[in-house]
């Protein structure tokens, strides 16, 4: 028995080491290729330049950074209220029979491939926006934000619903004993008690939205420009890499890898925030 436990211990250790090595290799690849490219282009020019014209050796990714921020921000404006309120409903208001139906639906949303979401956006959302907004061809920040807002719902609901459900029942019962209604007890006592978990769920949603590529590429327009309206098309960091990596060479290829470094930095900051919030929640 001890021998079997020892073998399993080594298996788990090997799995952990493989995971760490994989992340380390990715980091080495990104930074070894990306940082030299930033030096060649110029850090300020690369991060704040507004022109992306590889044929003229202009590699400014500021429009793509703005595009990623606008699309992600729009997705949060749409997805966070819906996701959090759905989590509250499922944890504290939902009848058991409806919960058994609603939970698999949320899980199914999480399992739908990105390309299917993108096809839905291209066939349904883009024509809808084109028809109702005369100044847009449909492929825009607004369309991508709506689509991403739907896509991050399973992430937000899946992470925040258990947190709300895990709040001690004594909090809720104490509020009822003081004369509060069921709704008031939930929204003034239970939800604030779960705020660290809900915020962590939102941060996970940000990471999901920021890293999404295929669905966004199909509906966002992909113009590398600084937008003046949510009805205009933009290009995000991820779509820029996917669209051009297949034919890029030399400095152009290195600039795309450097774009990956910037994206990696964004995701790293988000994960650090998530870890900090989890620690503060435990304390």
Task: Please provide the spans of the model-predicted regions.
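Transmembrane alpha-helices
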Residues: 159-160, 164, 182-218
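Generic hydrophobic transmembrane alpha-helix motif, especially the helices
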Residues: 107-148
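Periplasmic/extracellular loop-to-transmembrane helix junction in inner-membrane transport proteins
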Residues: 3-6, 10, 32-75, 95-96, ...
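Interhelical loop and adjacent transmembrane-helix boundary motif
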Residues: 216-263
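Transmembrane-helix boundary motif in ABC transporter permease subunits
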Residues: 74-106, 274-280
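Amphipathic cytosolic juxtamembrane alpha-helices at the membrane-cytosol interface
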Residues: 5, 95-100, 168-169, 173-200
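C-terminal transmembrane helix and the adjacent membrane-cytosol boundary/short C-terminal tail
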Residues: 161-165, 169, 176, 203, ...
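Transmembrane alpha-helical segments of polytopic membrane transport and secretion proteins
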Residues: 1-16, 274-283
């Amino acid at each position: 028995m001890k021998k079997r436990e020892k073998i399993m211990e080594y298996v788990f250790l090997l799995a952990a080491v493989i995971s760490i090595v994989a992340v380390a290799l990715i980091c080495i690849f990104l930074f070894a290729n990306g940082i030299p490219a930033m030096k060649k282009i110029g850090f300020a020019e690369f991060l704040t330049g507004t022109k992306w014209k590889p044929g003229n050796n202009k590699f400014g990714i500021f429009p793509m950074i703005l595009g990623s921020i606008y699309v992600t921000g729009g997705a949060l404006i749409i997805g966070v209220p819906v996701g959090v309120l759905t989590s509250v409903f499922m944890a504290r208001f939902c009848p058991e029979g409806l919960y058994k139906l609603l939970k698999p639906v949320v899980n199914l949303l999480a399992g739908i491939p990105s390309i299917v979401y993108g096809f839905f956006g291209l066939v349904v959302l883009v024509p809808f926006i084109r028809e109702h907004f005369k100044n847009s061809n449909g492929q825009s920040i607004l369309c991508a934000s709506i689509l991403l807002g739907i896509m991050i719902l399973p992430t937000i609901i899946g992470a925040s619903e258990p947190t709300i459900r895990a709040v001690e029942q004594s909090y809720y019962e104490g509020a009822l004993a003081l004369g509060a209604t069921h709704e008031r007890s939930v929204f003034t006592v239970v939800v604030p008690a779960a705020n660290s978990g809900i915020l962590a769920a939102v941060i996970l949603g940000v990471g999901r939205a920021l890293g999404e590529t295929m669905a966004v590429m199909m509906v966002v327009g992909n113009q590398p420009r600084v937008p003046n309206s949510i009805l205009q098309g933009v290009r995000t960091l991820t779509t820029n890499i996917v669209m051009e990596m297949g034919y890029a060479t030399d400095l152009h290829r290195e600039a795309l890898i450097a774009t990956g470094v910037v994206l990696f930095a964004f995701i790293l900051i988000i994960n650090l925030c998530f870890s900090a919030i989890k620690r503060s929640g435990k304390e």
